[in-house]
């Protein structure tokens, strides 16, 4: 993200062999990302990078950078297109992005979700997405998904066919009430993982948007959700989440003979990062899982005031929960999260 009043955003790239390229975007382009970088989307050989403030920070100070939305080549990181804050003046603090093609780029802001046609720079509000949550989209099967926050919640489906979203309700009767959705992610079989909370109970849910079938597994903690809206990360049926600096894993068993409470016994406490390293004072903006290796990536900072003392952790939890597979220190400035090219 960078410091929201004084710094531009940046992109740190870690190679397959574990080499770190600090501020890779600037290294390639000679210029910088916009202020408070928030989210990235991969589509058709391009990466779409959205920033909250672009070339003007929250207090109105102009900054020298490439703007609010930047489109780069996914292999070279070379800038192909840039949109300034004035180009996207309709948007109010954008935070998340998804892309289906050049004419269907979806951006979430404080009002809801807009569709951007990057060819014409036209922004169109998607009806039915009012107050869309500050959370990452799910993109699959040619559609984009977010969720409806609050007690009347469900999955919101956005199709490129029109600018009207469709709400898909969760089943009315469930073992663990869904009063609050903490986050969603795509499951490998086309279902959607849903982390939820209701009446004092947290659950991991696997939801099919076509049949509306849901499988629930209760967990013992209410996971921490960072400002980027990431509540958990998944690899196959392994779900990783955190409460403070303590990391947990749920091996999600879909056996229909099991009830939701079976998840309580299936949950594993893996490690407490603050017990390993005194500089791991805070988990910052969620977890990520490498789609090929299954290694879990975690960002920590010492404190908000001491954010330059930070660590990127990589764990192979099948091998060790105490000794990280890799550890990269002092590369981030308020990290927005981990982003991997889609597919295995």
Label every model-predicted segment.
Residues 1, 46-50, 104-107, 143-147, ...:
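Conserved beta-propeller blade signature
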Residues 1-70, 74-78, 301, 305-320, ...:
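Acidic/polar, low-complexity intrinsically disordered N-terminal segments immediately downstream
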Residues 5-12, 57-70, 113-115, 151-159, ...:
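Structural motif
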Residues 20-32, 78-88, 121-128, 164-174, ...:
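A short beta-strand motif characteristic of beta-propeller blades
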Residues 32-41, 89-98, 131-141, 175-187, ...:
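Repeated scaffold domains used in trafficking and secretory/extracellular systems
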Residues 50-163:
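Long, acidic/polar, low-complexity amphipathic helices and coiled-coil-like
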Residues 119-246, 250, 254-258:
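Acidic, serine/threonine- and glycine-rich low-complexity intrinsically disordered segments
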Residues 208-213, 218-222, 227-344:
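Hydrophilic extracytoplasmic domains
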